[in-house]
Amino acid sequence: MKKIYKNVVIGKNAKIGEYVIIGEPPRGYKDGELITTLGDNCVVRSHTVIYAGNKIGNNFQTGHGVNIREFNEIGDDVSVGTHSIIEHHIKIADKVRIHSNVFIPEYSYLKKGCWIGPHVTLTNVLHPLCKKAKECVKGATIGENTKVGANVTILPDITIGKNCLVGAGSLVTKNLLDDNYVYAGVPAKKIKHIRDLTCPYDLIKIPYEIEEVD
């Protein structure tokens, strides 16, 4: 059993799992008032909820139990892992991969090709429950092809450059603007250039090349 609300457009060759809800009206909107689009070849696995007002590209995939709120722009070839939460008014570019149990708050921007590891938490309010908190909601911006390791926490209004690697368990408290670097620690600091990484198993000389973004 699944529920597809009014004004939902789903492309060709879609696979929609059991107990999926697509087009859930956000508070203050009626069924079908907002258009919701998913491109071709999407795979939406069981118990996922996609609210109305989303624009989602081709080859989109979810794990199980994903929650995607309203008014997001999601590009082509994006995947969102099991039990991850995507809040509203978020921009996710092409070829972004979001692992399981990730939290992405409103007004975040994930640029093309970035990878977000499991249990990563982005935040968007510096002082929760402050009387003015709603006036300064600012999500993080993750640069093109940047990899964010497991259990990283990123504070509000942070920008991370492109082709970076943020080490597992890091706490990002300030902008990491230099492209092509490894950052790690609590708080996260610059460790080395991405080309200086080596494989401990001698399987490859350089784990990451300097990737160019189309």
Name each region found by the language model.
Residues 200, 204-214:
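ABC ATPase nucleotide-binding domains
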Residues 186-199:
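C-terminal end-helix/capping segment
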Residues 2-184, 190:
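Structural signal for interior beta-strand "rungs" in well-ordered beta-sheet cores
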